[in-house]
């Protein structure tokens, strides 16, 4: 049931999800920080699996950087949009395969088929069932070559609770709030797809328990998390200050506090 709701939600999002990561300076923090750390850890060349790649925003960037990429996603509408933008960006030769499916079953791929796997924008978190999430992690590991990087980003539970306080205080009295607070589980019905909201240490332990080496934890919005209006105002009105803030963000985003409060955070891992 949860998977059907996730598919329905993202089929309805359409071009909105394509625009999400570049809508404004605040949203670009997630996108640009993810790219920064991928550049840091990806091999110089190779084949990358974009698991839960949606409309292809990351895949296209990787294609432009010279990587070969396979997009794999649950939503047929997202994949339709991905095909369109892959053509528009003229990276068809790099992003040559676009496949529909759930990330907890990557059976269409052989073991150790990829030089890196990325699972960004919280597709793992959209699997509410814990056993299926663990299977998805196992699959991301299975299809990655030994020694290759694995990138996983999710939505942070503390940031979700703060969002409820600031933007949706009426929901605090509803049963959904303590459920998220105590378990991280959200089964839909309040304007967003079903999701498991993570604590940073929870994600780290889950990945390590499945056999990955966690190299870094990264707060993608970091200290700016929850301050969309202020972030966008700084970027728009004070470009010099914004440059300094970006430098500050990169210096602080791997600190435990920044990861903990971030709306999205990413684990940078390596398969032993």
Model-derived features with residue positions:
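A short glycine-rich, Lys/Arg-flanked "PGG" loop and its adjoining helix->strand segment in the class I
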Residues: 134-146
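Class I SAM-dependent methyltransferase SAM/SAH-binding core
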Residues: 57-105
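A C-terminal cap/extension of S-adenosyl-L-methionine-dependent methyltransferases
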Residues: 216-272
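Conserved class I S-adenosyl-L-methionine
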Residues: 1-54, 57, 61, 149-179
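A short acidic, Gly/Pro-enriched loop at the edge of an enzyme's catalytic core
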Residues: 107-116
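Acceptor-substrate binding/catalytic loop of class I
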Residues: 127, 187-202
């Amino acid at each position: 049931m949860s998977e059907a709701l996730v598919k329905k939600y993202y089929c309805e999002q359409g071009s909105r999800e394509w625009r999400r990561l570049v809508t404004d300076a605040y949203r670009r923090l997630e996108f640009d920080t993810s790219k920064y750390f991928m550049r840091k850890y990806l091999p110089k060349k190779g084949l990358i699996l974009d698991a839960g790649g949606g409309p292809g925003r990351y895949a296209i960037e990787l294609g432009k950087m010279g990587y070969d990429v396979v997009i794999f996603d649950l939503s047929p509408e997202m994949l339709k949009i991905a095909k369109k933008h892959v053509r528009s960006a003229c990276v068809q030769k790099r992003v040559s395969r676009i496949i529909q499916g759930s990330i907890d079953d990557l059976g269409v791929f052989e073991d150790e088929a990829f030089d890196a796997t990325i699972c960004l924008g919280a597709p793992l978190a959209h699997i509410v069932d814990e056993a299926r999430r663990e299977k998805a992690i196992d699959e991301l590991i299975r299809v990655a070559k030994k020694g290759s990087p694995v990138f996983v980003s999710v939505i942070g539970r503390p940031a979700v609770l703060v969002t409820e306080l600031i933007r949706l205080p009426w929901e605090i009295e509803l049963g959904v709030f303590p459920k998220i607070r105590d378990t991280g589980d959200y089964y839909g019905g309040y304007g967003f797809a079903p999701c498991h909201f993570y604590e940073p240490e929870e994600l780290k332990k889950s990945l390590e328990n499945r056999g990955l080496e966690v190299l870094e934890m990264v707060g993608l919005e970091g200290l700016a998390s929850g301050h969309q209006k202020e972030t966008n105002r700084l970027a728009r009105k004070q470009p010099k200050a914004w440059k300094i803030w970006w430098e500050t963000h990169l210096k602080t985003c791997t600190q435990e506090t920044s990861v903990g409060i971030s709306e999205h955070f990413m684990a940078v891992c390596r398969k032993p």
